[in-house]
Amino acid sequence: GQAASLFAGVRAERVARLALLDSLLLPDMDPDLAPKRLTGWLDALNDPPTQRSYDSYESLAERITRRNARLTPERALAIARVWGQQRPDGRIELLADPRHRMRNPILYRAAESYAVWRQVTAPTLFLDASDSPLMAAAGDEEMQRRRDCFRDHRRQIVSDSGHMLHHDQPEAVAAALLQFFDA
């Protein structure tokens, strides 16, 4: 959502509608953290994360469920089969670059995002989770300040969902997106 929202601001003429799912949650960062962040990033380049692997799709599904207790075992297994692939040795690994887990060397500066978001002209849907711990940590006032940067926006809350609302309530998320994009 962060990348899409910034693109919608700097290339406003190319975005007809923008939907953001439980998004814009990065906290503003203290500039004094920059030396430690850059040092950590450089150190990680010398020792990048490796890909985790699992005994089976079922064990990957168990890991996914530990991070999201709302998932049924069937839905977690379906996600595991999409997220994973079997290696020649039979183990399952994620179809993701493990370097994605590395921290960005640049600190997040909310004021820069606000300036870009004020350039968004597309109607914007904020599709938020009812029980997002990240949204709660950001605070209602800060989240409203961020939403208000978008000229034409509306907010819809998906009940009984956490940050991964598209996993928790895929039917409700799909219905909201279809209604918004078909308008």
Language model regions located:
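Conserved alpha/beta-hydrolase catalytic His-Asp/Glu region
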Residues: 49-110
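Conserved loop-alpha-helix segment in the C-terminal half of the alpha/beta-hydrolase fold
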Residues: 118-161
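Catalytic active-site module of serine/aspartate enzymes centered on a nucleophile-bearing elbow/loop
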Residues: 150-183
